[in-house]
Amino acid sequence: MVLTDKIGRTVNYLRLSVTDRCNLRCMYCVTKDFKHIPHPDILRYEEMLRLVDLAASMNISKLRLTGGEPFARKGFMDFISQVMDSHPEIDLRITTNGTLIEPLVPELKKIGVSRLNISLDTLDRETFKEVTGRDHLTDVLATISACLSAGIRVKVNAVAMKGINDRELNSFIDFARENPIDMRFIEFMPMGDDTKSDSRFWSADDILEQGREYVNLIPVKRTAENRGPARMYSIEGGKGRLGLISPVSSHFCATCNRLRITSDGQLRTCLFSDKTYGLRDILRNPELGDDALRKVIAEATVDKPLGYHLLEQRSGCEGVCETQMSSIGG
């Protein structure tokens, strides 16, 4: 079974959030009055594995495990192993803040994890504390170093924020020049009730222009391996690359191939939409089997919207959707 929407996009990528908990409090991810999902509402690992099994049967070939911070959930390493053992054919990726996992890197390598996306918005310790509310920069840098030493490919994701990390672009480029990483900037997307979005927005085009004033950035031709949303640039004389992801200024809705399932079992077909489809109650109803889940997933996929239409309708002080990013799963 192949998942296809009403405008002909094939969906083959699932982002599965295993928790909304995180050991950081990033300014763009949660607000002071943020409330966690109650524990009984969080999917059990066996329920998540059932969803992965279903996804694989529906031609999902790429799976990304996210949070919150996925490694903050007890038993996550065992869950990774179960997924890898059950579906060695799936391209498994993990997104993490990198603060908890330096000691786990050898085991991650052993069980077959070959790549990680690590969130890092700044290389400055004081700015890190300002952005995340915690003092863990050295832990993240140690994790990146350990991954590279172990042969795990690393993509570093930084949310581009004017007035926060725009002054560090040259430092980030140097970081990528010195290390074999993809250093990717993602345009800031206001979520939930964020009202500071316009003042923080730093466009991908502005980043590229600023970066080219510092170093020669050479466009990387798109290939089957490089078919994601990032525009990639090699750095002259460098080991790594610079990437730009522009969901706001230059959307990639026409080629979007992904679904999201939150840690409480809500299926979301578009990051810019608040429409959800409940899977948890079906999972926990003994009278409903996998066919009921397939039906919901297939019908939701058919109605997958073109998100930029929704983005165009928002006012400058509104988030792209009403839900906090930590609840959706970045």
From Swiss-Prot:
It comes from Maridesulfovibrio salexigens (strain ATCC 14822 / DSM 2638 / NCIMB 8403 / VKM B-1763). NCBIfam families: moaA (TIGR02666). Pathway: Cofactor biosynthesis; molybdopterin biosynthesis. One of its GO terms (biological process) is Mo-molybdopterin cofactor biosynthetic process. Coiled coil: none annotated. The keyword Transit peptide does not apply. Keywords: 4Fe-4S, GTP-binding, Iron, Iron-sulfur, Lyase, Metal-binding, Molybdenum cofactor biosynthesis, Nucleotide-binding, S-adenosyl-L-methionine. [4Fe-4S] cluster 1 binds at C22, C26, C29. S-adenosyl-L-methionine binds at Y28, G68, S119, M189. It comes from the Bacteria. The lineage of its organism: Bacteria, Pseudomonadati, Thermodesulfobacteriota, Desulfovibrionia, Desulfovibrionales. Catalyzes the cyclization of GTP to (8S)-3',8-cyclo-7,8-dihydroguanosine 5'-triphosphate. This is GTP 3',8-cyclase. SUPFAM superfamilies: Radical SAM enzymes. [4Fe-4S] cluster 2 binds at C253, C256, C270. Monomer and homodimer. It is an enzyme of class 4 (lyase). Disulfide bonds: none annotated. Its cofactor is [4Fe-4S] cluster.
